[in-house]
Amino acid sequence: MQPLAMHRATMRETFARTRRTTTSMGTSGKATGRRATRAVRVRAESGGESAPTSEDAATSGTPVRKTSMLVIGATGTLGRQVVRRALDEGYDVRCLVRPRQNPADFLRDWGATTVSADLTKPETLPPAFVGVHTVIDASTARPEEDSYAIDWEAKCATIQTAAAMGISRYVFYSIDQCDKHREVPLMNMKYAVEEYLKVSGMDYTVLRLCGFMQPLIAGYAVPVLEEQPLWGTDDDTRTAYLDTQDVAKMTLAAVRRDEAANKIMTLAGPKSYSVREVIALCEKLGGAEAKVSNVPVGLLKFTRAFTRFFQWSSAASDRLAFAEVLASGIKFEADMTETYKTLGMSEDEVTTLEQYLEEYFSKILKKLKEVGGESRQRDFYL
């Protein structure tokens, strides 16, 4: 069996097994979570005393505050924006971070608290969930990590822990149209996690994302300014990009509003763009001409098929499968009318791509002018 096929078969088997488990969890509802919580005795980080769980707090007359929040993946591009926004709105934010020699001090500097845990070691998770009302899961595998271990197995463990600890709301970030492209391992895992959440017994909110504006700086804006070659595609795929700060704003709106509970919503920017249009916008704002090398979609398909034959390249094949979808001419966009109503927001509150890139180029060009054009553009990001 080829590596990718083996990967999918294993995932289907695991999903079937875990779905059977969570079906029983879902039918018994919150009562099952309470029973599981009583079985999970969490040792406090100081003094060795048994720490009360979220359910224990509620039954003892000290209900968990609605403003208590755990952010998973808090050091990532999106996670840190969620932390910052939540703190600004008065939430008591706890961040789950990986054990490391140099912890994320900036999170504590902002006013959040941190707790160390390893997503791949479920036994380390429960202490992070004590006294928490809402979990926002912004974690995802890094390029060097095993996506299956982080984006599927760890997600199952995290959701099981949250349900057992009596978490009231679980917010999960998914990918737009993941249900339509399950041939792509990452999108298949995102869809499977969505289904897993539905039977967890918790209130949930799934936010499907189209694309972030932030990567466009390194991918297109900087190469245009530095007159470096960049890669494009000859397809008509369009993406409605969002600033991660706006995603954070929408996330907190979803947490506040009961109307967003137990819903799957797609978050999209005001307008969708093709790669060619993004490059043209960077050229216009940067006052330079881009050196573009287009990659034919056919080459992506061939490369993906070729890499399947090698065990060491299965991860590369997975990424190429995702790239193939991105270059297939589909539209990652959504009508946000009903979503804005649900969130109590309006389109005027969302940054457009033109505004975002214009702010970047105005700052970088001003800085370059001040230093005589000798600095490297890549040192300056919004």
Where are the regions that the model predicts?
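Cofactor-binding loops of NAD(P)H-dependent oxidoreductases
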Residues: 117
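Oxidoreductase cofactor-interface core, primarily capturing Rossmann-like NAD(P)-dependent enzymes
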Residues: 47-109, 120-132, 142-148, 161-169, ...
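N-terminal chloroplast transit peptides
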Residues: 1-34, 44
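A hydrophobic C-terminal alpha-helical subdomain
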Residues: 47, 298-382
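Hydrophobic beta-strand segment of the Class I
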Residues: 135
